[in-house]
Design a protein with these regions (language model features):
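Active-site region of the double-stranded beta-helix
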Residues: 1-17, 30-156, 164-206
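Generic recognition of stable, solvent-exposed alpha-helical segments in well-folded globular domains
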Residues: 153, 188-189, 224-227, 324-327
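Proline-centered helix-kink/hinge sites
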Residues: 23, 161-162
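N-terminal auxiliary "cap/dimerization" subdomain that precedes the catalytic jelly-roll/cupin core
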Residues: 1-63, 287-342
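Acidic, low-complexity/disordered tracts enriched in E/D and polar residues
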Residues: 234-309, 330, 341-343
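Hydrophobic/basic alpha-helical segments enriched in Actinobacteria
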Residues: 88-93, 154, 181, 281-284, ...
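Long, charge-rich alpha-helical interaction segments
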Residues: 194-252
Length: 343
């Protein structure tokens, strides 16, 4: 289905022609788009310990960055920007905005960062190493993307693939909503996988050399020690299933500052609407599910309705009220992973 959000393209057309290939500017992607969050509400979020925020101020040719939390947000009348990450975790409207982009797998969705800038405000020319949609809220912003210049207004949407140099400057007090995507790097992924293997137990062995002879060249690493290390490391093996499980747990792991609030009260699951908490990441591969860094494997019968919850982030409780699944949902509610609402 063609989407106004994507300039009249279907998601398939957009992904084929633009995704990770070239920028796209969509005028009027969300006509009449207003503020999902106010300036004061954004400042309130910036005061919290569980929210990442920063202020960037331009003075002459230099920019100064201060990290939050801030007891009080004081922005200059010009050349200042407040940026708050993960607004979708705290503001339902921002979470709904993020879900408009669910034609991209949930494993790739990251968060909604909101910036409020005074005239002249901006973070400066830079390159991101991830895909991003930049949706303009109230107020105008001038963009320079590579060698092109243009001005955006409320409801305009700019898509940028990784590696494209860009610079945005507020022409008047304005909001910009950045919908970012995760793109794990090889070194980061490799280090995390080795940690994951270590937690599950690596081969235990201790180097011994009872036949050691006096060293004629003390600085040389003994060949026997190299052989020992080679034999030991060759015993470290893994399967595709191990990689799948690691990746699911890794991609669903909440960010360090995320805190879940335990569910309050009891509600009959069969008469409830089950909604994932905005902070919850629920992914799956086959009948194995990954939620907030944990994994569980279910029967196909139980997996089918849970996939619906993962895909849509909301499901009728009656679909999830089986004995095994019902107990699981109740446990997740106690942990604050899901919200039970009146159906």
């Amino acid at each position: 289905m063609k989407s106004q959000l994507l300039g009249g393209l279907t998601p398939r057309e957009f992904l084929r022609r633009y995704w990770q290939k070239r920028p796209l500017l969509v005028r009027g992607a969300l006509p009449g788009f207003g503020a999902v969050v106010t300036k004061n509400a954004l400042a309130t979020l910036a005061a919290r310990d569980d929210v990442e925020s920063r202020i960037v101020e331009r003075r002459g040719g230099r920019r100064n960055t201060r990290q939050g939390p801030f007891e009080r947000v004081n922005l200059g009348k010009s050349n200042s920007t407040l940026l708050v990450n993960g607004v979708n975790l705290h503001v339902p409207g921002a979470d709904a905005l993020l879900q408009r982009f669910n034609f991209v797998p949930q494993a790739r969705l990251d968060d909604v960062m909101v910036s409020y800038a005074t005239p002249g405000g901006g973070v400066g020319p830079h390159v991101d190493f991830y895909d991003v949609f930049l949706l303009q809220g109230p107020g105008r912003r001038a963009w320079r993307v590579e060698n092109k210049r243009f001005v955006v207004e409320a409801g305009d949407l700019l898509y940028l693939p990784p590696g494209v140099r860009h610079d945005g400057v507020a022409l008047e007090p304005c909001f910009t909503y950045s919908i970012g995507f995760r793109a794990p790097r090889g070194a980061e992924l490799g280090a995390a996988f080795l940690d994951w293997l270590h937690e599950r137990g690596l081969p235990q062995a201790e180097y011994r050399d009872p036949g050691l002879a006096p060293a004629s060249r003390p600085g040389r690493i003994p060949g026997e020690m190299v052989s020992f290390a080679e034999r030991l490391l060759k015993r470290i093996t893994w399967s595709r299933r191990d990689i799948e499980r690691f990746l699911g747990e890794y991609l669903s792991e909440p960010k360090p500052h995320v805190v879940f609030k335990p569910g309050a009260g009891r509600r009959a699951l069969a008469r409830s609407l089950v909604r994932l908490d905005p902070k919850t990441r629920l992914l799956y591969s086959g009948a194995r599910f990954f939620i907030n860094g944990e994994s569980i494997e279910l029967s196909e019968r139980n997996a089918t309705p849970l996939r619906e919850l993962a895909d849509r982030r909301v499901a009728q409780g009656a679909r999830l009220a089986g004995s095994r699944l019902g107990g699981l949902i109740s446990h997740w509610h106690e942990l604050g992973y899901v919200i039970l609402e009146k159906s």
